[in-house]
Regions:
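Acidic, low-complexity central loop/insert segments
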Residues: 1-15
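Generic recognition of cysteine residues
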Residues: 10, 47-50
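Non-catalytic protein-protein interaction scaffold segments in large eukaryotic complex-forming proteins
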Residues: 20-22
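Glycine-rich, small/acidic residue-mixed loop/short-helix segments
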Residues: 24, 30-41, 49-51, 55-160
Length: 160
């Protein structure tokens, strides 16, 4: 992939396998299923390793992590792919693609714990010296509830 494609993919939130994903990534976390234009995983076809996990998350909703765009502090050296992302001294995710955008400056894709507020103060880099801000437009919708989750809530008396 050429650098311009990395830049475009990063800005659009299109993850690269093995760079923006890790061995624990499930399709829901990176928009490969259930998102606009998604088509990497089909729920009704075939048998594959991890299918039960994919079906459970699809029906109950709420994948454990989310792919977001981070705006990075440009006054220090740019962090690297794979660097930890920290909030309050605790690891909350990892960096994927890191690029220099013409208009936005340094940006990166990151897999972060789901539910992390958009205004959370984040740091990254080898020495945790690079400030990072979540692009709130890249956050997944908060009302993303699967059919199975609605059924569970109905049984518990929460949804009518």
């Amino acid at each position: 992939m050429k650098p311009i494609e990395w830049l475009t993919g990063c800005r659009l939130g299109a993850p690269r396998l093995g760079v923006d994903t890790d061995e624990r990534t499930i399709p829901h976390e990176v928009g490969w299923i259930g998102g606009p234009g998604a088509g990497a995983v089909h729920l009704n076809k075939g048998c594959y390793r991890g299918q039960e996990t994919v079906a459970r998350v699809h029906n109950l909703g709420r994948p454990p992590r989310m792919l977001v765009l981070l705006h990075l502090d440009e006054s220090v050296q740019r962090p690297s792919t794979g660097d930890a992302v920290l909030a309050g001294g605790r690891t909350v995710g990892r960096l994927g693609t890191v690029v220099e955008h013409v208009e936005l400056g340094p940006v990166a894709l990151a897999l972060l714990k789901r539910g992390l507020p958009g205004d959370t103060a984040l740091v990254t880099g080898p020495e945790a010296e690079v400030a990072a801000v979540i692009d709130v437009d890249s956050l997944p919708p908060a009302d993303d509830v699967g059919a199975g989750r609605r059924a569970v809530e109905r049984l518990r008396g929460g949804i009518r």
